[in-house]
């Protein structure tokens, strides 16, 4: 029996949505080596899916049909063990993962999976932790985890952990997935990376501030990403999310996004999804 067939027996099945960085500005490098950022997060109604069933023996077990997904170093397992340790819970969890989001794509796959795990286990283990506490634990797993825990589109500052809820337009997006995994560490260590963008002080963020400071470095290092940006740029403004590899463009309706997708996905992998300011994970949690 496959992991996905097993998931049908899960106590709770939840989505782990993708995110886009609608803009990403790098303000400088901190003494600890991390970079000060300003970015705008919005969710997509598309993502991974995870199933959860409580175990009585305290074991954390992850099953997936996707080859190459590590166990002990996987953020899902790390999140579960961190919450187990911090809460003192003696219960365990069987977890199933249906992976749709690419690894190294800049759309938050691993971070979103970790956040969904924290919220699911908090619910099933009946821990009663609030979002603030879960987000604080999430930050120890990755800078993008807190925004997924909170589930609202946000303007993020610091290393991405200082979040201000925002409500940008919710268009349809075509997301292209170049078949290359971009190393975030490699991009942020590149000597030619822009690191001196002046901070945005106006709220809400002006529409013209949609630049991604990582784009030039990623295009230079990864011709596959440059090609995807060029092709999509024939139809709409093409943007890079995070450090890539995924690129995206906004469309006023699904029909237009589907039309361009049909043309471009003959040679490139991609998907069409609706932008959402409230994550589909939180919409589902609200009805539990």
UniProtKB/Swiss-Prot annotation:
EC number annotated for this UniProt entry: 2.7.1.148
Keyword Transferase: yes
Catalytic machinery residues: 19, 144
Family: Belongs to the GHMP kinase family. IspE subfamily.
Binding of ATP, residues: 102-112
Catalytic activity: 4-CDP-2-C-methyl-D-erythritol + ATP = 4-CDP-2-C-methyl-D-erythritol 2-phosphate + ADP + H(+)
Organism: Pseudomonas savastanoi pv. phaseolicola (strain 1448A / Race 6) (Pseudomonas syringae pv. phaseolicola (strain 1448A / Race 6))
Protein known as: 4-diphosphocytidyl-2-C-methyl-D-erythritol kinase
Entries under Gene3D superfamilies matching the protein: 3.30.230.10, GHMP kinase, C-terminal domain
Keywords associated with the record: ATP-binding, Isoprene biosynthesis, Kinase, Nucleotide-binding, Transferase
Keyword Cytoplasm listed: no
Its job: Catalyzes the phosphorylation of the position 2 hydroxy group of 4-diphosphocytidyl-2C-methyl-D-erythritol.
BP-aspect Gene Ontology terms: isopentenyl diphosphate biosynthetic process, methylerythritol 4-phosphate pathway; terpenoid biosynthetic process
GO MF, any single term: 4-(cytidine 5'-diphospho)-2-C-methyl-D-erythritol kinase activity
Signal peptide start and end residues: none
Pathway membership: Isoprenoid biosynthesis; isopentenyl diphosphate biosynthesis via DXP pathway; isopentenyl diphosphate from 1-deoxy-D-xylulose 5-phosphate: step 3/6
A Pfam family annotated for this UniProt entry: GHMP_kinases_C
């Amino acid at each position: 029996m496959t992991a996905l067939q097993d998931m049908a027996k899960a106590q709770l099945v939840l989505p782990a949505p993708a995110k886009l960085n609608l803009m990403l500005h790098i303000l400088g490098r901190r003494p600890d080596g991390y970079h000060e950022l300003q970015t705008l997060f919005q969710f997509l109604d598309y993502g991974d899916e995870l199933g959860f069933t409580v175990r009585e023996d305290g074991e954390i077990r992850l099953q997936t049909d996707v080859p190459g997904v590590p166990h002990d170093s996987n953020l899902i397992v790390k999140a579960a063990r961190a919450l187990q340790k911090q809460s003192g819970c003696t219960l365990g969890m069987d977890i199933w993962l249906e992976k749709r989001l690419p690894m190294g794509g800049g759309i938050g796959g691993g971070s979103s999976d970790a956040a969904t795990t924290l919220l699911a286990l908090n619910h099933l283990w009946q821990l009663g932790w609030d979002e603030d506490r879960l987000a604080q634990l999430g930050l120890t797993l990755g800078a993008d985890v807190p925004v997924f825990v909170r589930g609202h589109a946000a303007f993020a500052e610091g290393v991405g952990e200082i979040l201000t809820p925002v409500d940008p337009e919710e268009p349809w997006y075509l997301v292209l997935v170049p078949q290359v995994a971009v190393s975030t560490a490699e991009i942020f260590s590149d000597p030619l990376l822009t690191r001196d963008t002046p901070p945005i002080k106006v709220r809400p963020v002006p529409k013209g501030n949609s630049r991604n400071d990582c784009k030039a470095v990623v295009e230079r290092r990864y011709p596959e990403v440059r090609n995807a940006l060029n092709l999509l740029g024939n139809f709409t403004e093409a943007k890079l999310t995070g450090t890539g590899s995924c690129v995206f463009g906004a469309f006023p309706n699904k029909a237009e996004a589907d039309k361009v997708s049909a043309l471009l996905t003959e040679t490139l992998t991609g998907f069409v999804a609706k932008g959402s300011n409230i994550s589909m994970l939180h919409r589902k949690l609200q009805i539990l």
